[in-house]
Amino acid sequence: MSVEIITHLGTVDPVMKRLVAAAGPLAIESRDDHSPYEVLARAIAHQQLNGKAAQSILNRFVSTCGQGIFPTPAALLALEDAALRASGFSFSKIAALRDLAAKTMSGVVPVRDVLHALSDLEIIERLTAVRGIGRWTVQMLLMFQLRRPDVLPVDDFGVRMGFQLAYGLKRLPAPQVLGLYGARWAPYRSAAAWYLWRAVDLSRAGQLPPCLEAVQLPRLPRKRRKAARKPPRRLKRVAVSAAPRAPTGVRTRARRPPARRSRAPKKKK
């Protein structure tokens, strides 16, 4: 399968072909074998925190609230907010965890076997219904837990940075542009994303091959292009005199204001 993927990427994209040769064999490894509920709960814990701080919170959560085992959805819903706060969760994350637990018990977030039977789009639609879970989080689950082969996380900063570096661009590509360009990598866009992540590492090590082609990025339709652009800056208002200026070298007579007519005093009767 890896040979088939590399052959396909090299056939449809010469820049990707050189990147694959520099990065070496594809190595997308499964991160863990947790249930979708636990994967998403851990993702919520990691939001806006570094890995060490998030893992410390999860360790306290498992030890104090689950007696060494990750709490089930029912057990999480039975916990008081004070217990979750003592573990280190913020109020917004507590609300997200409770919503995740409730939707897991109702079947919106299915077990792994049911999840495998759904398409990528169906999984994204169902899991992003959970509070605090966005498209990127679900795409990471698709790539690393479910090993789906055709996922391109266009909003991922590392993927966009890798594309900019590998393709010799002056700026980061817009997510919509990256999505349109990356359509040629299907049905192996997960592998392409992995190689774009590797492009960042190769660039830091000074081993990234230069882009030899003039890459033509797809143009967005007019409505999307306007949305992708930055809002225009507001121009400062400059006071302009209402009186027109005379051309250079032309003498003009200054206009005097009209004289006010004085009324004659009324005669006394």
Ranges and model annotations:
Residues 1-28, 120-121, 135-269:
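C-terminal accessory module of base-excision DNA glycosylases/AP lyases that mediates lesion recognition
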Residues 3-4, 15, 22, 49-131, ...:
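Alpha-helical ds-nucleic-acid-binding substructure associated with the helix-hairpin-helix region
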Residues 29, 37, 53, 68, ...:
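Short, surface-exposed helix-loop/turn micro-motifs enriched in polar/charged residues
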Residues 30-38, 88-91, 182-189:
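Structural motif
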Residues 35-39, 75-78, 123, 178:
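Alpha-helical scaffolds flanking conserved acidic
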Residues 37, 41, 50, 54, ...:
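Hydrophobic (often cysteine-bearing) scaffold residues that line and stabilize catalytic clefts
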Residues 42, 59, 63, 98-102, ...:
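Generic alpha-helical structural context detector
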